[in-house]
Amino acid sequence: MGSGESKNFGNIAQQSRLDHADLTVLLKQFNAISKNGEIKKDDLKKIIEKKYGSDSSLTAILYNLFDRDGDKTINFTEFALAYGFLVNKTLDDVVDTSFHCMDLNGDGNISKGELRAVVMMNKKMEKYIQNDKKVPLDKLTLLPIEVSKINQEADDLFLQLDVNKDGGVSKQEFIQLASSSPELKKKLTSYLVRDEALDFFGTTK
């Protein structure tokens, strides 16, 4: 990202719904961890693992959230947009982002395995917060009955989403169903990273 872009707070503020003070703090954080104006997946992975422990699902979800254009790097605009999305999100602006985040391998479809991983990560995050963030995600243990219940929840949801029963949920299926059912939209968007987890970059908003 060039210096001209980093100074263009006006456009970024409008898109991210963050103010100048927020962006100034974010730019300092971005510069502290970026190399040549960008953050690569391995860089983000190290930050996430330091905070939460090793959890590939969380890393994939967060990286997909930040890497908006899919070029495998995160520039400051993407960094600010993702943070702004997390702190200012509404039901109407998260459906597309939810699909992008849940499509863990970026192949354009959500598989049953990916949906299970997303729901499992979400439940672990709930437990992480309940434990005052003292136990890393990869150290949290779930009882077999909890795992079974979580997988069943994910499988039931997958059956709803996989309209044409081809074993994958396309973006079209996802958006169509979420847009036609407020209850389903709320459920799907609740699986995104929770606001309480925003401190992995040291943010305090």
From Swiss-Prot:
GO terms for molecular function: calcium ion binding. It comes from Dictyostelium discoideum (Social amoeba). Residues 54-89, 90-125, 149-184 form the EF-hand domain. A lipid is attached at residue 2 (N-myristoyl glycine). Ca(2+) 2 binds at residues 103, 105, 107, 109, 114. Belongs to the recoverin family. It comes from the Eukaryota. One of its GO terms (cellular component) is phagocytic vesicle. This is Recoverin family protein DDB_G0272130. PROSITE patterns: EF_HAND_1 (PS00018), EF_HAND_2 (PS50222). Probably binds two or three calcium ions. Ca(2+) 1 binds at residues 67, 69, 71, 73, 78. Keywords: Calcium, Lipoprotein, Metal-binding, Myristate, Repeat. InterPro entries: EF-hand-dom_pair, EF_Hand_1_Ca_BS, EF_hand_dom, Recoverin. Pfam families: EF-hand_7, EF-hand_8.
